Amino acid sequence: MSSQSITIDLWTDIACPWCYIGETIFELSKSSFLSLHPSTTITTIIHSYMIDPSTKPEGEDYLSYNKRRWGSDSWTIQLKEIGKQIGCNFKNWKFWANTLKAHMLLQESKKFGKEDEIIFDLYRLSYEEGKNISNENVLNDLAKKYELKEWNNESNKMKVLEEDQIGKNKFDIHGVPMFIFKETGRKIEGAADPKKFVYEMELALKK
């Protein structure tokens, strides 16, 4: 008998604009898949990953960071065009965040099953509202929305660092978002075509 549940491990970083796009495509694909398989449950387990832990703790100016890393921000032109097609806007992208503390808040939200909502709020704050999600005041405001009081602690910090290292060392992840389907062990990296996500879900369901 085919399984009626699918579990996906997702490694992601809020400072990764392709993660915003890739996860939005995934959510759209998931809705499409569930319309065909309404009795199926899809569980996404979010894991913290930091692309550039050396980003200044307070975050960095968007353009300055791009110039330092890549010489310019010209690579974002295609990104923004793709994002626009699925409702991901980057109109107020002002900071390149150090995401350690944002991931700590995300870890706290996982204890209460609020991670799926809060991660998209973090993306919107960063890319659409021009907020610096390295800033504790910004994160505290978001924490209040979800009634998360004790997020800024050593336990959450250690969990972030642990998941980051597991992703990089155990699973050899060098790019995010990375979706790993537990039933098949198959992977999807990046902002893949919606049909690819649906195909992998179909394979997972047959296991």
Model-assigned labels for residue ranges:
Residues 24-126:
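Structural alpha/beta surface segment adjacent to cysteine/selenocysteine redox centers
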Residues 1-4:
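Eukaryotic N-terminal targeting leaders
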